[in-house]
Amino acid sequence: MIVRKSMGRVKSLLMLLMVLGFSFATYNLVFMMMEHKAGNDLGSFDGKAMEIRNTNSKYHVAVTATDAAYSQWQCRIMYYWYKKTKDMPGSAMGKFTRILHSGRGDQLMNEIPTFVVDPLPEGLDRGYIVLNRPWAFVQWLEKAVIDEEYILMAEPDHIFVNPLPNLATENEPAGYPFFYIKPAENEKIMRKFYPKENGPVTDVDPIGNSPVIIHKYMLEEIAPTWVNISLRMKDDPETDKAFGWVLEMYAYAVASALHGIKHILRKDFMLQPPWDLDVGKKFIIHFTYGCDYNLKGKLTYGKIGEWRFDKRSYLMGPPPKNLSLPPPGVPESVVRLVKMVNEATANIPNWDSLNRS
């Protein structure tokens, strides 16, 4: 056992052990309940489920983050655009929380509403820092006061480009279908975590945890299982090799399926430049991919372009103000992204100095 000086860390570790113990018990319970599956699905929420309906209920925007400069500058841009779109017609945004899983506060505490939680015990993430995300949500849900009944799980590299309504219902969360999350094509691996007795692997949605809008009670049920499945997947060499950097996304999808939850799949939830060319009526720009073009506006993906925007170019500090716009011929989605970054950096105080490692 790792000895911690902070009693808060000790309590956090004890809570993790309790979560894992509960999750293992929950997972094993699946096998015991298969004979009664028709009326007793694990976590099917039959007692809480209400008539499916569109809702105008507000959702709480929650983004998990670290205190690294790379995470900080993205969070600052995201929060800027949250504030600009929050009260626009059509938006159902409530309050905002940056869930900081570094175990300590940072210099953005007074700028962005922040809730500090502990990281996983040292070494447990095995260098895969995203494993801290489900554990961060477990702690936040357990300890924080959350006024809204729904939660949007978001990421630092999300920019709100249009007012986002509540896309979920009481018993159906809303998620984005990722083309690279393919449960059916990985059935052998999936069966380690989603047994045949549970049903076909197509029950597992092709999603990650973000972006997802979900009712709070559902996330409270899913989150401990999500922690457990994430750690079990990381501990399995075959799964770790096959899923790589999207392992935690698969873990959320499996955890949801184990609880009998299907998501409304919304392709308009998000766009991802440079592959998505137009913004249209989509709601979030996800700038996870590098955008590389020659001066004729031709995409040179996989090769550094004469013009480029890639968030990984700014690992140690923020991008400069007034980035050059893409050359003519570059898709509108990329142009819009750079313009939105430029607007944010021009208006956020102390942009060049506050968030540097």
From Swiss-Prot:
Deletion consequences: Dramatic increase in root nodule number when inoculated with Sinorhizobium medicae. Inhibition of root growth in both the presence and absence of rhizobia.
Keyword Glycosyltransferase recorded: yes
Gene Ontology MF terms: hydroxyproline O-arabinosyltransferase activity
A cellular-component GO term for this protein: Golgi membrane
Presence of the UniProt keyword Electron transport in the record: no
Function comment: Probable glycosyltransferase involved in the O-arabinosylation of several proteins including extensins and small signaling peptides. Catalyzes the transfer of the initial L-arabinose to the hydroxyl group of Hyp residues. Probably involved in the arabinosylation of CLE12, a signaling peptide that moves from root to shoot, to interact with SUNN receptor kinase signaling that regulates nodulation. Involved in long distance nodulation signaling events.
Name the record gives this protein: Hydroxyproline O-arabinosyltransferase RDN1
Organism: Medicago truncatula
Designated gene of the protein: RDN1
